[in-house]
């Protein structure tokens, strides 16, 4: 009886060990990208980390950018571009390091610059909006980039103020590695923790669109002060493609953004008509908002061409 029990225990432990190894090696569970809270930025990816999720390589440098280590200023013969964005620019765990929009921009630029070195920085994090991006620029600067590109999506026009309380509470923003890959899998199905009572509620602006447009205006002003070229691009939600198109409140927000770009003389690329002209626009998306590798390639190509 004892022998049978021992065999069962060993078998169960062996199965758990195999499951743990499989989850780590095949899917990258147990080693998620870690976030850190920031009073001004809200949150950002913890610096200097590497992992692999679902086979996709994720590397974060010392400035919490998705990319390899870099110097504060580029070499004299290097063209540096800084791309600001949210999960669409960052790529998340579902996008390999070489298939993000900034990585594709760098690859395309190298081919077209005929030998000139090109760096494209990826300063982004999941669910960042213009206020987060502005706070990042204020804290870290523009790294002597000659061009700054802000890529937003329609939802970003309604972004809330930066909220550091999500770090370590929301499963999408872990602040530490789980003890086991199995634990992380179970945590994916557990409800997020409510914000601690000690955390003051984040005040929601009365005019969310105006609040975000002000942040875009300030990013442009900072770029102008450093003689950097500033460019703004917006990708649409999947449901905005075709008919009936954007909802009424989104159309109003879009008009306000276009008016800002005209008033401030900002180079603005609206990808809604570009996506609508694509023969198979559904292939540009992996879900309702995030782009597929083909979508990333189209955006990268347009940002390089203009």
Describe the predicted segments one by one.
Residues 5, 285-306:
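Histidine-centered active-site loop/cap adjacent to the catalytic His
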Residues 7-22:
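Hydrophobic membrane-insertion alpha-helices, especially the h-region
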Residues 27-108, 112-113, 275-278:
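Membrane/wall-proximal cationic-aromatic binding patches
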Residues 57, 81-82, 88-175:
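Conserved SGNH/GDSL esterase-like catalytic core that processes O-acyl groups on lipids
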Residues 78-79, 116-118, 143-148, 224-231, ...:
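Loop/turn elements at helix/coil->beta-strand transitions in domains of secreted/extracellular proteins
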Residues 88-96, 122-123, 205-209, 244-247, ...:
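Second-shell loop/turn segments in exported
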Residues 153-258, 263-266, 271-282:
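Serine-dependent acyl-ester chemistry module
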């Amino acid at each position: 009886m004892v022998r049978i029990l021992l065999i069962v225990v060993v078998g169960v432990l062996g199965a758990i060990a195999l499951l743990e190894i499989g989850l780590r090696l095949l899917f990258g569970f147990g080693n998620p990208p870690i976030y850190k809270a920031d009073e001004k930025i809200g949150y950002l990816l913890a610096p200097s980390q590497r992992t692999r999720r679902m086979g996709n390589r994720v590397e974060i440098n010392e400035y919490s950018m998705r990319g390899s280590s870099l110097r504060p200023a580029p070499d004299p013969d290097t063209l540096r571009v800084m791309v600001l964005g949210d999960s669409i620019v960052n790529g998340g765990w579902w996008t390999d390091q070489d298939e993000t929009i900034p990585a594709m921009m760098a690859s395309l630029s190298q081919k077209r610059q005929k030998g000139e070195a090109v760096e494209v920085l990826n300063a982004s994090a999941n669910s960042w909006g213009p206020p987060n991006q502005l706070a990042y620029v204020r804290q870290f600067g523009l790294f002597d980039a000659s061009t700054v590109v802000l890529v937003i999506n329609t939802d970003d026009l309604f972004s809330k103020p930066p909220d550091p309380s999500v770090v370590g509470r929301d499963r999408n923003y872990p602040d530490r590695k789980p003890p086991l890959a199995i634990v992380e899998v179970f945590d994916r199905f557990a409800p997020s923790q409510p914000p601690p009572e000690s955390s003051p509620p984040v005040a929601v602006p009365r005019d969310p669109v105006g609040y975000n447009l002000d942040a875009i205006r300030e990013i442009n002003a900072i770029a102008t002060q450093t003689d950097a070229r500033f460019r703004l691009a917006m990708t649409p939600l999947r449901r905005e493609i075709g008919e009936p198109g954007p909802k009424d409140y989104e159309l109003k927000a879009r008009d306000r953004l276009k008016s800002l770009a005209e008033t401030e003389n900002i180079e603005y690329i609206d990808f809604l008509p570009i996506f609508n002209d694509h023969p198979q626009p559904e292939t540009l998306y992996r879900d309702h908002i995030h782009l597929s590798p083909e979508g990333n390639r189209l955006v990268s190509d347009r940002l390089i061409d203009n």
